[in-house]
Amino acid sequence: MAEFKDDTLYGTSDTHMYMMEWEKHYMETCINLLEPAGDVLEIGFGYGYSATQIQQFDIKSHTILEPDEGVYKKALKWAKKYPKAKIIKQAWPCIDNLDKYDCFFHDPYIEDADEELLKYGCTNMYFLIKCIKDLAKKDSKFSFFCSVNGDNNNVGEYFDRLQRTLLTECPSAEYKISVYQYDSTNVPSHCNYTREGWLYTPLIEVQQ
């Protein structure tokens, strides 16, 4: 079970940092770019930063998948203040009990991602394609935690590959991809999953 300790949400060991408190402003920035509306699906609750920001928008419903028992209980307590929120104790990418959605936000931590989740090179690409094919309405928007290790050339290559993968896997859809570098000077030195200069806020708009 995950454990909240100091400024970090840890997984099965201290090497698995699920989330940290410094992410609050980054999460809020991603959600503000997404501008949630209609029915929203969020993968992962963590500290609830993105969930709370989603609730600031005029949404119809807000479904959150959270598999960890401790974080799930925290999410249930949080949801008492937000009648549009529905918490499902379920691990991504299981899509049982899910409907169709207008907006998606993806930030799970998967300690042992299997070959299926990594078939496109990273879990974010799998998330996009899975949702577009099975869960998205005709017009939909997506954002996710995006840390690209390296310089701007690597960032360009990452999003070029993402676009090529989308066009190959979902050829009948139209896409608009926007990405902005995030001022990540507040990332602490003991964070082991990203660092200053690696964070981006993506927005993918889809019509199908």
Question: Which residues are covered by each model-predicted region?
Answer:
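Conserved SAM-binding motif I beta-strand of class I
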Residues: 61-66, 144
